[in-house]
Swiss-Prot record:
One of its GO terms (biological process) is heme biosynthetic process. SUPFAM superfamilies: Chelatase. Its EC number is 4.98.1.1. This is Ferrochelatase. The keyword Lyase applies. Catalyzes the ferrous insertion into protoporphyrin IX.
Amino acid sequence: MKKRIAIVLFNLGGPEDIEYVKPFLFNLFYDKAIINLPNPLRYVIAKIISIVRERKSQKIYSLIGRKSYLIQETEKQKLAITKKLKEILKEDFIIFISMRYSTPFAKEVICQIKEYNPSEIILLPLYPQFSSTTTGSSVKNFLQNIDIDIPIKTICCYPIEEDFIKAHVSIIKEKLYDKNFRILFSAHGLPKRIIKAGDPYSFQIKETVNKIVKELNIKDLDYKITYQSRVGPIEWLKPSTEYEIELAGKLKKDIIIVPISFVSEHVETLVELDIEYKFIADKYNIQYTRIPTLGTNKIFINSLTNILIRFINKTDTNLVMSSSSKRICPNKFTKCLCNLIN
């Protein structure tokens, strides 16, 4: 008898129009994984932030067509994975998209999954590197809302997956040139307190970059890992991407910037990297090259497809592990997904 498999792609979400910016911001900051405070304090803070930041965020989204492109980018990835899986897989399957802070929310997706009536569910985050604030939050929210007894296999991360690394390397090589350049691998930032609490995100970012640099095989490659999108006065991961662009500008080094934790084009790449950070580079009259996100890159889609095939073929039920089929983080990282949901 054929399996019926429900595959769920997790992503952040985003406003479909600038009128939805405030509820999107509220949902984001009301998440306990983002602001770890009890209610009603967290509710009040999320309300205040969403009101205060609404107009500024609307102006940012107005620069890219008044909406987030992440939703349609994720839909393209879903279609690409579906097409590739159909070439290989004999089992019946449907791929669903579940956004954390905008529609379609987990509750809506679970209703659709019930109608499909699968024999198992596979959860695949579109966050290559695990964090309790992204994949962890999405998985916990999904599991809290699901009310059917179906085996669930969860892919927590794939920071060193072979084809994921190859996809980055192939795109970077297309943009390399024989000049005085520095590569900045720019990842979304996190408050340091989250890392100190045992989150493996920055460790996995380093693992990804180390693998890419090794595969690039360029002698004395000048590169740095940087972090962007800082919000608020608390201490965040360093160095900031903005700071490193300023530093490179003073040294008259050209910049090649790689969005290492983003697999879809959205506001942080299209505005922050393409407009705000490019402005800094232009100020110093240095060349600024931004590498595209992986999107529907064939090697990347192959990577996700291969991960799914491996998990479909596993006989274990209620499985939680990395794409490598083993724990890849040292034990000191206590915010591993296995610890969070068990």
